């Protein structure tokens, strides 16, 4: 068994199924007619700096460069920002540095990045600072006239890229952003449509589903990863164990260390590229939470109430069977030699040792549940999320947090602390977070969310499709 879904038979078939589903979705979207809008701004006939009429676009006249100039006029009657930033180029000419998607200028289509501005309302911009020009354009109302030299570089097609945010971001708290007002605030898990990424440090994006149509600046993945890596931090403490097999032991450490190079890029998270798929069935329900938060009660309730839908994979152990235990029912009993051999062959999804005995869950056991068209329930350590979050297992990952009600005992405070440690490190993997104020309430919310996820369009990692 390998970690990549595409390398195994089961993983390959699931990868292909999701790829076909995505292709069908794209074809259906492409067949729909697209709306066309016409901006209401007024653009005059082209003029030339030497005063000549349009002569069929000569490049030079008498050895002098002919620069094509356009007069752009539009009315600004509100306090709405124009949605552009300016800069001085190497010739100290005022040029358009950035156009925010959805802003006034973007909607009009009157300016483009790189356009050189010569005059604003008849005033030459020479010898004016960028701050002065930005302020003048912001405060001006009524009819605005701009004399510009268009950027002759070819226009790139609009991006069609969506990213899932893996961190919280507030531009007002960011000292690196060039313009805090132009920043886009978002939270972990938000889907961001990337509009422009010409700037290597600051991309433009818009939160999907937001009522705000205009785009804002977000740190690029490179900038965010550099920022996080540059912050001096003390060595991170080990995440609290939430495994039913107890704390991870040397066998598991060895196993995870063997594959750590595969996931090195996940140590510093920023964004994850995603695609939107039509509804499809999630094959695995993963419960994550600190030890003692109540995951076992939730899991057992799901199994008892929905035996035809959910199945818990029977784990393997080297512990000798007790008198009342039947092989293959509570556990699969195998020798230490066989389990060690299976571990070396990467057949275990997760494993550990407890009181001198080894316990673990095999990939094949989960696959057999899927072949029965049932949903496998896993309660695993958060470190294992990197392994199970594949198209092969198609998991729906639910984080169970401790109650925020009742008396704050010392035990509850410790549980909340352990829970927050898991959340802070692994929240970008979660599809759903629930506070366990009661098993019945939590169970109802979980099942509703799971059914909704399986019956609605879903954002999934692009690696599940391509």
Swiss-Prot record:
The modification Phosphothreonine is found at residue 49. Keywords: Acetylation, Cell membrane, Cell projection, Lipoprotein, Membrane, Palmitate, Phosphoprotein, SH3 domain, Transferase. The modification Phosphoserine is found at residues 13, 19, 52, 57, 110, 243. Residues 158-228 form the SH3 domain. It is a lipid-anchor. It is found in: Cell membrane; Cell projection, Stereocilium. Palmitoylated. Essential regulator of neutrophil polarity. Regulates neutrophil polarization by regulating AKT1 phosphorylation through a mechanism that is independent of PIK3CG activity. PANTHER family: MEMBRANE-ASSOCIATED GUANYLATE KINASE MAGUK (PTHR23122). This is 55 kDa erythrocyte membrane protein.
């Amino acid at each position: 068994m390998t970690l990549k879904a595409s390398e195994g038979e089961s993983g390959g078939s699931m990868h292909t199924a999701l790829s076909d589903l995505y292709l069908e979705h794209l074809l259906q979207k492409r067949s729909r007619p697209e709306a066309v809008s016409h901006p209401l701004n007024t653009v005059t006939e082209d003029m030339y700096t030497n005063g000549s009429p349009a002569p069929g676009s000569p490049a030079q006249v008498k050895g002098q460069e002919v620069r094509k100039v356009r007069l752009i006029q539009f009315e600004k009657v509100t306090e709405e920002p124009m949605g552009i930033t300016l800069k001085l180029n190497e010739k100290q000419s005022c040029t358009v540095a950035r156009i925010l998607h959805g802003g006034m200028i973007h909607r009009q289509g009157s300016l483009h990045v790189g356009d050189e501005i010569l005059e604003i309302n008849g005033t030459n911009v020479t010898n004016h600072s960028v701050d002065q020009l930005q302020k003048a354009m912001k405060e001006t109302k009524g009819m605005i006239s701009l004399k510009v030299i268009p950027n002759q570089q070819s226009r790139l097609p609009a991006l069609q890229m969506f990213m899932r945010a893996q961190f919280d971001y507030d531009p007002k708290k960011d000292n690196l952003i060039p313009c805090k007002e132009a920043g886009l605030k978002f939270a972990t898990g938000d889907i961001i449509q990337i509009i422009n990424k010409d700037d290597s440090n600051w991309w433009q994006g818009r939160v999907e589903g937001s009522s705000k149509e205009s785009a804002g600046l977000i740190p690029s993945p490179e900038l965010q990863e550099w920022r996080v890596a540059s912050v001096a931090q003390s060595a991170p403490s080990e995440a609290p164990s939430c495994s039913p097999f107890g704390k991870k032991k040397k066998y598991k450490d060895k196993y995870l260390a063997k594959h750590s190079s595969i996931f090195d890029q996940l140590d510093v998270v920023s964004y994850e590229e995603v695609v939107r798929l039509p509804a499809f069935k999630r094959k695995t329900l993963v419960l994550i939470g600190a030890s003692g938060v109540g995951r076992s009660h939730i899991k057992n309730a799901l199994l008892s109430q929905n035996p035809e839908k959910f199945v818990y994979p029977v784990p393997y152990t080297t512990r000798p069977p007790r008198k009342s235990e039947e092989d293959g029912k509570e556990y699969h009993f195998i020798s230490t030699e066989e389990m060690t051999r299976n571990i070396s062959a990467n057949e275990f999804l997760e494993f550990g040792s407890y009181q001198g005995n080894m316990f673990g869950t095999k990939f094949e056991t989960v696959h057999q549940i899927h072949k029965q068209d049932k949903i496998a329930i896993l309660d695993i350590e958060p470190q294992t999320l990197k392994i199970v979050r594949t198209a092969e297992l198609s998991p729906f990952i639910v984080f169970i947090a401790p109650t925020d009600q009742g008396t704050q005992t010392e035990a509850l405070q410790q549980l909340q602390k352990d829970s927050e440690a898991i959340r802070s490190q692994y929240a970008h993997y979660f599809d759903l977070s629930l506070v366990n104020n009661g098993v019945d309430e939590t169970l109802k919310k979980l099942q509703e969310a799971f059914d909704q996820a399986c019956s609605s369009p879903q954002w999934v990692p692009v690696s599940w499709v391509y």
